């Protein structure tokens, strides 16, 4: 047994404390959080933190944790960061009694890999506050439980806290994850700040808290699809064919080079456009540049603007990053009358007061200081910045730019700030990308962000899986109806180019938008390849929560639901329950994700497949439900694409019977109301 395995099995040290670890200034750290707790609540926060440790250590740890709470607004327990390097190892290197649990351990470590995580030492994976655990004691204890558990047990995870191992059975999930599940009346931003500071709840974002983040590749594909289809909309509106050749030279302007938003420059390159992405955090910008995800860094607008003009004129495929405030960028583009084709934003506006958005007129360092020391002044600065932000976008939109909200609460927070973002009827001036693109073209037809991770961590296994997937999609395309041929063609192109685009950051993983038929056939083929030894180790199947069925989010995933049910969350809850008893290895359900705490309910799953007949059964049963639950809900909302998809699925699957909506002549309804 090596030191890595010994440290995992040791869990939380019981005999001797590890030495305090120096604060590493070479990595990106979370900003200081709001000082929100009362004096008595701070006492409670310390008591809550100390309950993980034997009483003999409390006198030494209490002042240390109190200082962390004062300095950072949270108790992270930095001392307990493990001594080993953090990355996903091949499955056979983990100490375990359950191979399924070993796979989960690898997925957890991939989330925390410094190449992958946004603020790894604060256990924040992406989005400024998307946490996998609240503190390092929770990480250590969880890894110990996973190493010790059998396939007859289930680990319950309460917002990062491992509540314990409970007896179950081999077909039950090995882990059930909940994040941020609070009583609905206590789901405001300050509630999260308070509960998180107390150590009793966390914001798990989506794949951050559910052990399914695969680095920026996870969103590159969705962003590529979005940018390409937005470009097609623009070209079509101009009477031009939506070909890749015609997209060259188009200008896409946006913001954010963080964990999720860092995908935008790569997506722009794959789509073949000129992209300009603003990022105020120099460390984040440099990280994406060093990883090869953005081509050029520019700190001066006087240098950037001529470079943009030249790139557009030469129809280059290039990604430019502006290291500065996005409002300054938008205002300069408007002042110079630069013809922007596509505009969006991926600042973390789901978290506007705690590092998700930095106001114009302040340096990054000044904003961090104001955020912690003058929170109300910071809030007003953010609101004023959003008003200017929207004003510049409106000027460029009047000149023909197509702007879309990328599901980060930009429209929502801008409206709350009093920006000119609403139409006279109270609706938003700009669409969500789900309303215009992902909803009608992808989700309604059952296409969503299916993904897999090779537990061998061997690139050759990933290459083999790519080959299998593309062959299955090409076969599906042969008999596919016209409505989904475009989606299949885009995804065939994606997977064929994936290796050349160097998308892997962290684990050997791939994402691919596929429908129920595609996901199931691909997964079964993977399982057969494992069985035959063509793929050398198990594979983890999963998806982003940003999918057909997993998320109820009225300002994003379900923004194209128009029957009045977009503020309900039955679909997401039904989904996680159904996945849990149909063969998922782990399931998760979260409050928040994408648009923010209190605005969303979202869930996900992971499934370990190992070449067994049980894996075949789990694939067939669970993936079918995981997609068709959402199609059924969307078809009941009378979404045309979903109605087509569910009727096709009922023809393909005789055991499926879905309640079908009858359409009404609106004139009959209006007349009935008028005659009352």
Language-model regions: role of each:
Residues 319-347, 354:
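Active-site/ligand-binding-proximal alpha/beta "capping" segment
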Residues 1-196, 201-209, 375-525, 529-542, ...:
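Long, compositionally biased, glycine/small-hydrophobic-enriched stretches that function as flexible linkers
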Residues 204-225, 232, 239-243, 248-251, ...:
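Catalytic or ion-translocation cores adjacent to nucleophile or general acid/base/metal-coordination motifs
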